[in-house]
Structure formats: C-alpha cells, structure tokens
Amino acid sequence: MDETSPLVSPERAQPPDYTFPSGSGAHFPQVPGGAVRVAAAAGSGPSPPGSPGHDRERQPLLDRARGAAAQGQTQTVAAQAQALAAQAAAAAHAAQAHRERNEFPEDPEFEAVVRQAELAIERCIFPERIYQGSSGSYFVKDPQGRIIAVFKPKNEEPYGHLNPKWTKWLQKLCCPCCFGRDCLVLNQGYLSEAGASLVDQKLELNIVPRTKVVYLASETFNYSAIDRVKSRGKRLALEKVPKVGQRFNRIGLPPKVGSFQLFVEGYKDADYWLRRFEAEPLPENTNRQLLLQFERLVVLDYIIRNTDRGNDNWLIKYDCPMDSSSSRDTDWVVVKEPVIKVAAIDNGLAFPLKHPDSWRAYPFYWAWLPQAKVPFSQEIKDLILPKISDPNFVKDLEEDLYELFKKDPGFDRGQFHKQIAVMRGQILNLTQALKDNKSPLHLVQMPPVIVETARSHQRSSSESYTQSFQSRKPFFSWW
C-alpha cells in the first residue's frame, strides 16, 4: 500500500516521533514498541475514571492513607497504655509511700513508739542485731538508747535470701532435703508474728506484746552490696550535684518490711522460772495465777498451730512487790501478793497450710509440763468459749487475718484458704475440749482436723463446711 492510498491516515503520513517532551526530564532511546511509564506532568489532566492508569495511581494513595490512619491509632493506643502504666506506677509508688509512713490511727500508742524508733535512727542510734536465733532480728532503741521493740525484717527470716546467720545457709547447702518446713508458707514469718498479735487481741488473751507490720531502714540491717552502692552513689550525687540528687525518690537505703513487736521488760525465759518454781514451790494463789496465764498460752498456740514453741521462747515475769510506805521509824514492811504474767513471743512459725505430716511433728513442748495435766479452768472457758463458738466471730477473725496477710507481695489466696482451714480445725477441737472439761495434754492428743469451705454450684447466703481428719502422721511422731 503506498502513501497516497486513502486507507492511510493523514496523521500517519509523517513518521512517528518517539521522543519525550523536554520538560519530562527523561531521555530514552526512540525505539518503536518500547513501553515506559511516564509521571504525569504538572498541570496535566487526570486520567479518565475507570482507566487502568487511574486505578494504579490511586491505589497506593489509599493504602498510604489507611496505613497512616492505622499507625496513628497504634500510636494513640500506645500513648494511652503508657499513660495508664505511668498512672499505675504512680499509684503503686504512692501506696508504697503511704505504707512506709507507718501510720496506725487505730493504735496511737503503738504509732508513737514507732516514731521514737524512726527518730532514733535519724540520730544515728541504730537497731542492734540479736545474735541468738536463726534469723536476722534487731533490738530497736529510742533516742535515749533504751530498747523499745524487736524488729524482724522479712528478707532476713530463717529462709530469707538476706539472712545474716550462716547456719540456715549451711543447712540449705548441705541438706536441702531437710531445708525448711513444708507445712509453712516460706518468708511469711513477719505476718505470722503480726497475726498472732491480732488473734491475741481478738480473744482478749493479752499475752502477746503488740506486733504490727512496719517499714524501717537502718545501716545495721543486712543489705545487699548493690543497695549499699546505690545508696552511697545517691548521697554523693546529692552532695556534688544537688539538682540531680533532688530528683531521686529516696536517698538512703530502702526500708525493709518486717514485724515490729513492743519490748517487754522484767521477763525471763520460762525455762528459768519453771526450774526455780520446781525447786521452790509457789504459794497456792500465785500458782493459780501461773496456771491461768499458762492456759492462755495454750489457747493461743493451739489456735495458730505454733510449730516452734519451746520453753525458751515464751517468757514469765515474777514480781514480788514490797510495800515500804510504812513509817521510816519502823523496820516493818508489808509484802504484797506476787504477780505472775506470761508473754508469748517468737510466733513467726505459725499458721501452717497443713498439719505437720512429713519428718517432724513440731510438738508443743509445754505439753510435758505438770500444768498441762490440769483440766481447763472455768475462767478460761468463760473467756474463750463464747467467742470461738460464735460463727460470726470466727468469720470476722478470718477476714481480719485476710486483710493482714494480703499485704505480702507474694500473697496466694489458695494458700491462705488452706491456712484458715487448719485454724478452723484447731478451733473446733479446742471448743470440744473446753466443753468436755479436758486438759491441755488431752487437747494436743486429739486427731488433727481440717475444716474447709464446701464448694457449691448454687449461691447461698450462708457458707457450708466440710470436715476431714488427717490420718498421715510425721515420721518422728511424739504420741
């Protein structure tokens, strides 16, 4: 077909120009049939809707818009999460700071003693370590240097990681199979001390020196090397660069949580006085006082199931006051009736989650005393039976213990229910022993009981309980 043929278009008369406009900025060889994609020039009209070019150019823009929106939402959620985390951390820090203030509005006398201890530490009158025992415990002093309390930090307990006594460390290293007491919750001794004081106050026994959970910091406590280095670094920063040092929440050593028990004066180990009373018998009235105080110790130890009660960790105060108010011209003095009181200390190994059933039975050593063979008196029955026979009283006691025990960072609700089940069983046995006019010796020979809350699929306003007896005995049984 020649160029003059009517089938040839006039536009095709000239050879096609495959070069791009100079404004495009692209230079490609003029090859017929070459496919290239050219960016639209500024001011050029949009592609017709529905054309392939239009879809290809619009799709990335939509994807970018959606991606930007999703990224914005993610950043918003992350910012909200960070804000919530910051609020939670601030709330936790505020709660911790509130606890560390050691405020006891329900017991202003106890709070005043704690303030004296804090003031003494500020004046560099530090607590003094007690070298007896298997844990880190300290005599706390007032600004005048007098002993006012005994402090037992949580992390310095017999099985704590900062226990300064090497005996437990050696036992753990050489005999791990016999390390610890599997019937107890480890590192909860400070709560056990405070719990025993709570039970004592609820039952109005008045034999446990008031004990509560307190936070204290002292140079004489056993801290890790890291804590001491951090404390020295913060103090140095505060001295050298005050603007930086003032930003720290705490400058000194971190406070330790532990049990703070008021110190009792004039008491000696029960073993000392019991041996003396055996050699020098007491008058009848004085011996009666000792028996009534002894019964209170039995009630307390049995309810909390104290696994560490010997005759060397409860105290007796024997006071024989002399009345010298008579005339100085005479040599006569009037001797008043002696006064005997008992103090139950060292209650850190109580509230087990099961009755001892492995190697040792952890008996009550007071069960071998002659006072344990005497039936319970009417005075102790009148004091205790109305309380422990009332389900509402027992329930209130459980709730108070729950509020105390849940303060521990490692609190486990399941373990607490097991502890309460053991305590209910002890209360059940004690109630029956008091009603049957039994003696403390007969009480400890009763079979161990566990009273658990019955599980029911139906909701009920009242709780039901299941009672079970423990048949397994420890390898080294004492009865």
Swiss-Prot record:
Residue(s) carrying Phosphoserine: S5, S9, S44, S47, S51, S462
Positions of the UniProt region annotated as Activation loop: 344-364
EC nos: 2.7.1.67
Region described as Important for substrate binding: 157-159
Outcome of swapping K168A: Abolishes enzyme activity
Mod. after translation: Palmitoylated by ZDHHC3 and ZDHHC7 in the CCPCC motif. Palmitoylation is cholesterol-dependent, and required for TGN localization. Ubiquitinated by ITCH; this does not lead to proteasomal degradation.
Entry protein name: Phosphatidylinositol 4-kinase type 2-alpha
